[in-house]
Amino acid sequence: MDTSSTFLVLALIKDHQLIGHVQKSCWKHQSEEIFPELTARMDRNGLKPSEIDQVVVSKGPGSYTGVRIAMTIAKVFCAMGNKPIYTVPTLELFAGKAAHVRVLLDARGQRVYTAVYENGQLLGDVSVQSCADIAGECGSENIVGDGHLVNREDVWPDLAQHFLDLEDQWHLEPNVHLVKPVYLKSTTAYLTGIH
């Protein structure tokens, strides 16, 4: 599950196949939509909560509140049901297994979370940069995510499929109670309203 951007993403995977999924834009409404959408997908597949044997959740970076929505639900479900919890970095989820791609996600305040991936592997670092700075670095790179922040087209991949594609890269967390979201802060001071 992922709620780190403008989307609510849920994927039900059984025997390495997607059996139910949703990816819908519902910015600031993910917390209202997640349970009805999850229940609908489970009902369509005849699943009860007790039959879910593990949960995979994106861990950030992304929208501060958004990352916490999916993370909290995943942690509570896994803790109550004594189920394993896996995590995947949000930008890695957006990149999937693309040959070469730069991920851009809105970090607010004219900033962007960004990283470059090659076949599902991170090249360099995940960072927060100003939109103006990163626009010059993008060149002709393939971009997924909030392209409009650098005067490019927004490109939204099939994130449910990416959860499945990245199955070999899910990280099993040893203790559900210690799983924490990843937050990045800009290295440049971000001040407003100071004269």
Language model features by range: what are they?
Residues M1-L18, H29-E32, Y86-H195:
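Oxyanion-binding and handling regions
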Residues G20-Q23:
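Short amphipathic
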Residues W27-D43:
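N-terminal phosphate-binding loop and adjacent alpha-helix
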Residues L38, I73-F77, A95:
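Buried hydrophobic packing segments
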Residues L38-Q54, E137-E141:
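Phosphate/pyrophosphate-binding loops at sites that engage ATP/ADP/AMP, CoA/4′-phosphopantetheine
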Residues N45-S50, A79-V88:
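Phosphate-handling active-site elements
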Residues Q54-P84:
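DPxDG-like acidic metal-binding loop motif
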